Amino acid sequence: MINFSEKIYSKVKAIMDTWSESGIYAISFFVYSNEAYQYKNYSNISTFAISYNTEEDCEGADLYDEERWNYAFWRQDETPIIDPDEEPEMTALLFDWYKENGITDIGKEDDDCYDSNFNYIGKGPVGHYELLQIISEVASKLQSEGYVEQHFGKDIPIIIHGLEYAWYDIEATKKANPHGEADIFIKAMKELGMIP
């Protein structure tokens, strides 16, 4: 049985151990799928990279400003964890995990994924939501065991997201921060109208 969660945890923690820049106030777990992303005979696969933002990066933005919380304004200097081009071993392991768990049709999307008000209610392409669940477990473990607070000297949120903040990204972010570490992020995004 593949302990994929533990593999991701070890890789993420090893990278975060190298982060020593001052002023880090948020960690990005960027999980994104795109039809251009391909692995073997699959397309529209999900990738995963991590990064962070600092107070200096957001140039003194107020606590609830978009510049502080919207990833579009961040430095976006990601380190890939799962990527078919840059981290093929982890991508292969992900696909082995999919197979082991009976997840098929990777990358396919349901055409009926919007409600009557045209709100997206789908879970992304097949495999994306399942990967988000593992990543939120990893983030929650980092928070619950006190690693984030010990390493950075304070509680900071781990934000799980794509280019947009879909309902499942917000769900994953809430699970990832079990002690309310992301409450300010959630409130800011609601005030900005970026999430319902």
Label the predicted regions.
Residues 64, 69, 131-139, 158:
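Generic hydrophobic, helix-prone segments enriched in Leu/Val/Ile
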Residues 140-196:
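Glycine-rich, aromatic-bearing surface loops/beta-hairpins
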Residues 8, 12, 90, 94, ...:
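Generic structural signal of hydrophobic/aromatic residues within well-ordered alpha-helices
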Residues 1-32:
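Short N-terminal edge-element motif at the start of the domain
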